From Swiss-Prot:
Belongs to the class-I pyridine nucleotide-disulfide oxidoreductase family. Its cofactor is FAD. The active site is a redox-active disulfide bond. Keywords: Disulfide bond, FAD, Flavoprotein, Mercuric resistance, Mercury, Metal-binding, NADP, Oxidoreductase, Redox-active center, Repeat, Transposable element. GO terms for biological process: detoxification of mercury ion. Residues 2-66, 81-145 form the HMA domain. It comes from Bacillus cereus. A metal cation 1 binds at C13, C16. FAD binds at A181, G201, T206, K216, D472, V480. The gene is merA. Disulfide bonds join C207-C212. It comes from the Bacteria. This is Mercuric reductase.
Amino acid sequence: MKKYRVNVQGMTCSGCEQHVAVALENMGAKAIEVDFRRGEAVFELPDDVKVEDAKNAIADANYHPGEAEEFQSEQKTNLLKKYRLNVEGMTCTGCEEHIAVALENAGAKGIEVDFRRGEALFELPYDVDIDIAKTAITDAQYQPGEAEEIQVQSEKRTDVSLNDEGNYDYDYIIIGSGGAAFSSAIEAVALNAKVAMIERGTVGGTCVNVGCVPSKTLLRAGEINHLAKNNPFVGLHTSASNVDLAPLVKQKNDLVTEMRNEKYVNLIDDYGFELIKGESKFVNENTVEVNGNQITAKRFLIATGASSTAPNIPGLDEVDYLTSTSLLELKKVPNRLTVIGSGYIGMELGQLFHNLGSEVTLIQRSERLLKEYDPEISEAITKALTEQGINLVTGATYERVEQDGDIKKVHVEINGKKRIIEAEQLLIATGRKPIQTSLNLHAAGVEVGSRGEIVIDDYLKTTNSRIYSAGDVTPGPQFVYVAAYEGGLAARNAIGGLNQKVNLEVVPGVTFTSPSIATVGLTEQQAKEKGYEVKTSVLPLDAVPRALVNRETTGVFKLVADAKTLKVLGAHVVAENAGDVIYAATLAVKFGLTVGDLRETMAPYLTMAEGLKLAVLTFDKDVSKLSCCAG
């Protein structure tokens, strides 16, 4: 074998690395390492294969190969090892420059220093010890910490070659057709895999069919109806009559159909993978049975999602209750709606029907809404919902549920007192359970956890290394954007031969109530539990000019920072369009920005996002004493 380095232009991301790697593998290359940042591919070829063939393969993949360099065996000493080194004592970009110069003088290459994250990335020749770099940093008056050697192979292609595994019907079978499934299929097709997707029901999964899309369009309708009846401006004589729910639901269903076709169904032919309709179950680790036919694949992805689950309350099974799916198909607004469960689904759908005209009561076992959130967030949304007229029942013990004609009765005990809550409709919104019981997972050696979730490792592999899983059927945050991220990563690992870890350290979440709730990073309590010395800022919404002009001032901004480094650890918001605000905070948390970084960054006036800037100023100032935009 001969080893080569080829310069490659046109790569912009890790996906490009995979495309180049697949192209090289298909023409016979081995030990492939592609790096889009350095713009190069390193690989081995049999002695009888010309490097020009490899360059042609790269060109056929729509990238631009440059000069090729053959490695001689003695050249290993010229190769580089890559390190990540924690560094304390940096406070600004000037510190970054000092460390970069020190490392360069020690022989390091490819140096990247980030004072916000407190780390340095660099490469050293194989024969240079890491202690030389650490000594150079110490001599520059900074404090080096632990050094981690970044094994290029750990995130590059493994020795997996699907071409060597025998004959199968498909390279990749995906069970499910939601966000994780489609993301994975698209990525796998880009890696030249033959892909099939199996779906027993409606294509598109929860989000587009019965979750995000239908609920959010109806929530918007409810907000407009509520504002028409309760607008805060004098001189505007608005009103709203009773809601005709049937045509509103039809409009919602038309939108769902349109988005399902555009974002899911039509993509099947666009990308060229196969859809198989039917129930699937594993026969063994390489085979599933669908509609009586056995189908084989080299790799599988289980992305079957989750469904509503009901609590164990006596009498509930005998009551005609609603789920989040069936509620959105009602053709008439009920006079009264009781909601068991006050998580994000219960709050959103409860407020929706309150805004459409129902008398709504939310019931939950815990003493406060969103008990896993910071108290300030719970207090703000509790105040908002109660101000709007929604009934909140907390600290409830459920005794039984019964139906008396058309009336559903929920018997609870609160602080030792019995109470019966009656309504024409009862919504159960107490959580979701993974969908996997019909898959016959034991036949494939796939284990599940105590909740029925599929057990996966950091690379999205199940307990069978040929079978991966992603999305709501696994542990972790149940958001469609998380599912899509995991689905793409699963394909890169399963088909692309990579070994990339899933990273869910910084995941924003939004509850689409009005005001909405958005959060990212650590709460104050979580930060303390992780050992941080914490500094917090709490800004009431009536200190944000946008809220004042909107005449909607119930809400809060809260920031959590590391008291030592002032890095932003978490951001939590209750405000109009909080979900649109939280992305900026997500970037701050992910990239280790500090309170100072945000303080020195301008925010446009009269936007809700300005609340982040004002919350930053609140760490050190009383913003009520500042003029507009002063900081």
